[in-house]
């Protein structure tokens, strides 16, 4: 068994009974209580840290393993998901914008041109895209939106941009760098595109571009290139959240970056790294949910986090774990539209919270990657 913490705030994890186990227990100085199990059961590993911030290294399963996990505890806040009115189309990797009560959802995988609008009661078809696409970027409102990049049957990496006026999509200036699985933030005539996957060496890109309503101009690059990331905010005040990075480590990342209209800077990392999640909100108040948390293994998750401009807090989970879901709304009134469960779905999930209340700590194990130096 391994341990961490102090005599009055201890943590015990891994070991054998003699069966190799993944169980974790916490000690308060008087008694032990069960906590979240490790991802990989093992014994004879190493441990260090505190009760609410520990690390487990290596061990045997019974073969030698080098995997590393961290034990994390975060504030747990009130906020609830509920099932809304289903869309007419079931698809994954759609794009969304607008508010939770007036969202616009379009495209999807396989590449489709359909658009749907919600009026607070029911969904109706909107104007069809000129370019059927999936995994694109988007920004704006239900009646004034823009979509850019993405992929389709051909070409595989789009640079095409389209603007929506509430009924019709029209072509606009192309992205400088065609890409898919990128981040998008802002408004129809003041949008920001960043990150993504492009047909260049390495695949991942860090470049950002700013849209003025007709043409794109280069902005400064992100610190870490990545794709399959999520976004929130405006053209001059955006967040690039989590995603998949190829260097270093070929892994999903917890890293978050903020854009101030000129440059990117590192801000507080998310609690759970993920690829294919969704987010909404602003640079100082964001909601993150769903996605694929495991590298190179398909999973869906229901994990939800809220950002307050300083750090991330755990919120109530989605009712249906999804990846490739579209988003709209705000941290207090959010929407998750469709996705993969692993079957495609047209389910709408609505998040609502008023005056969030801190409900204590939520603890879990999270996989870590590392590099040799």
Predicted regions located by residue number:
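Polar, enzyme-active/binding microenvironments
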Residues: 1-373
């Amino acid at each position: 068994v391994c341990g961490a913490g102090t005599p009055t705030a201890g943590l015990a994890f891994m070991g054998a009974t003699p069966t190799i186990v993944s169980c974790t227990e916490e000690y308060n100085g008087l008694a032990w209580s069960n906590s979240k199990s490790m991802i990989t059961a093992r014994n004879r590993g190493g441990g260090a840290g505190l009760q609410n911030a520990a690390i487990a290294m290596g061990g045997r399963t019974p073969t030698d393993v080098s995997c590393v996990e961290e034990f994390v505890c975060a504030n747990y806040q009130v906020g609830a998901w509920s099932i809304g009115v289903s869309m007419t189309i079931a698809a994954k990797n759609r794009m969304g914008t607008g508010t939770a009560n007036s969202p616009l959802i379009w495209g999807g995988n396989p590449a489709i041109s359909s658009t749907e609008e919600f009026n607070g009661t029911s969904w109706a078809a909107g104007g069809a895209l000129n370019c059927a696409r999936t995994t694109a970027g988007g920004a704006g409102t239900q009646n004034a939106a823009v979509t850019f990049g993405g992929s389709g049957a051909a070409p595989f990496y789009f640079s095409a941009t389209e603007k929506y006026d509430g009924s019709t999509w029209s072509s606009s200036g192309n992205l400088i760098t065609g890409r898919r699985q990128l981040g998008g933030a802002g408004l129809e005539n003041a949008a920001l595109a960043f990150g993504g996957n492009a047909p260049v060496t390495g695949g991942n890109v860090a470049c950002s571009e700013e849209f003025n309503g007709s043409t794109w101009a280069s902005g400064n690059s992100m610190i870490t290139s990545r794709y399959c990331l999520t976004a929130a905010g405006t053209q001059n005040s955006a967040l690039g959240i989590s995603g998949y990075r190829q260097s270093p480590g070929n892994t999903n990342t917890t890293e978050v970056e903020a854009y101030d209209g000129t440059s990117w800077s590192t801000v507080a990392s998310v609690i759970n790294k993920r690829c294919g999640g969704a987010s909404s909100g602003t640079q100082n108040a964001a909601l993150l949910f769903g996605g694929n948390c495991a590298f190179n293994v398909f999973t869906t998750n229901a994990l939800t986090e809220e950002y307050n401009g300083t750090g991330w807090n755990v919120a109530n989970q989605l009712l249906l774990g999804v990846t490739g879901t579209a988003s709209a709304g705000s941290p207090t009134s959010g929407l998750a539209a469709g996705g993969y469960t692993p079957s495609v779905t047209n389910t709408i999930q609505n998040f609502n919270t008023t005056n969030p209340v801190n409900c204590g700590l939520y603890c879990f194990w999270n996989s870590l990657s590392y590099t040799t130096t």
